[in-house]
Amino acid sequence: MRGVPALIVALAVIGIGSAQAALPPNRATATIPPRPARLRLPPVQGPKRSDLPLVVIDAGHGGHDPGSSSSNDEQQEKTIALTIARAIRDELLESGRVRVAMTRSDDRFLVLAERREIARALHADLFISIHCDSAPNQGARGASIYTLSETSSDRVSAALAARENKADVINGVDLSGASDDVSSILIDLAQRETMNTSSAFASLLQRELAPTIGLKSTFHKYAGLMVLKAPDVPSVLLETGYISNDDDLALLTSAGYRHKLAVGVRRAIEAHFARQLVERTSDREELP
């Protein structure tokens, strides 16, 4: 956790949540569930260089959780999301500038906490969750991106968060009692810094994707999505288009569209890490 006092890092690692008095009252607090006991980590692909940034790509849904479906029920979100996630992975690996891991590379179910904690356990530098949007209004279309906020930016964002966050319960994994086991720990300013970094990356995604794919007029939205709640990994959820809209569906199932999308994501990622490198270099130069 960059910029977090050693005491707080130690508390986070060992799960102690009783040291609230150790810091001034202006520190941010967060409730973090423990990592799953049997977390299965995926392989890290790309150059064998630990100094290169690691991007974790999460294909939404999977297994017995199909996600949303097309109007004719022939296409499922879980399949389209995985295909797009693979396209982004391949584009990143071809560039050779980052390392990549996927939360799932086949049709399997993962609870939301597993997806998030895979990124944390791998010490990822960026987490991107891939989804397809859906709406009763079949005229709705366009890509959008979500970053974490406890306050949703609008009713649609709130509905999305409610729908996605219920995925574990409706698929037989009831986490409603998890709050009894969590440790309440101080995260200092790390959570806020992570959220700010996530929002900055969302802006880069908008810049790189706007010229090539159709974006919603309100491209960047905020919601309390569980999968984005890693306190130390910048995270975004990318809605690649509406599976409920026939025109968007044709794009989502098109290799050409997937390639444009993957290129835009790759460019945004490269710009993101280039910006971070410049900022770190500038910080070192300012030291006495």
What does each model-identified segment do?
Residues 1-288:
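Catalytic-site microenvironment of enzymes
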